[in-house]
Amino acid sequence: MTQDENHQLLERELAVDDPWRLDTSAFEQQRYAQMLRMSRRDGDAASALEVGCAAGAFTEMLAPLCERLTVVDVMPQAIERTRLRTGKWSHISWVTCDIQRFSTTEQFDLIVVAEVLYYLRDVVEMHAAIRNLVSMLAPDETLIFGSARDEICQRWGHAAGAETVIALFNESLSEIERRHCCTGSASEDCLIVRFLKPGGASAQSNAGH
């Protein structure tokens, strides 16, 4: 699937009242519950980054857990819908940008990236996006990744899904926890993983042993 086709698909989905049934699907609620639980493991985040906000369902859950939240999405419609949904919070910054090109000097202590990376053209682009994300994650801090599995994403016309991307993240981060969310539907099957970036206190502690 080309990038133009991806964007056209996203535009159509974002035009409906409940895109991807994010507010009404039991599967999506199960997925969000796991992502939120993992996000809260280390307490509230001083500075968090959410990559891909869809229509704001998870952003609305994540915002109260952060002192500062930066939301990045390539689709202006997604940013606008989420901004309207989360209007009561003033600590959210909005960036319309491809994650491969997003750049900041800020180091985040929580990054959440779910159901996003399979929209990239190929594994080379996924790897580049992952390197960019890892560079923005502070040492000893958490990244939450979620995605439909490889077989499903490839059936949708994408290059790869969860298993491939998890292997790429494991090249530079430490996998701490993995959860499998699924239903009887062939398209409702995803993996959610909590990663930790080695370094800082943990690296010094390991060096002393």
Curated annotation (Swiss-Prot):
This is Nodulation protein S. The gene is nodS. SAM-utilizing methyltransferase involved in nod factor synthesis. It holds the Pfam family NodS. Keywords: Methyltransferase, Nodulation, Transferase. GO terms for biological process: methylation; oligosaccharide biosynthetic process. The lineage of its organism: Bacteria, Pseudomonadati, Pseudomonadota, Alphaproteobacteria, Hyphomicrobiales. Its EC number is 2.1.1.-. Belongs to the NodS family. It comes from Bradyrhizobium diazoefficiens (strain JCM 10833 / BCRC 13528 / IAM 13628 / NBRC 14792 / USDA 110). One of its GO terms (molecular function) is S-adenosylmethionine-dependent methyltransferase activity. Transmembrane segments: none annotated.
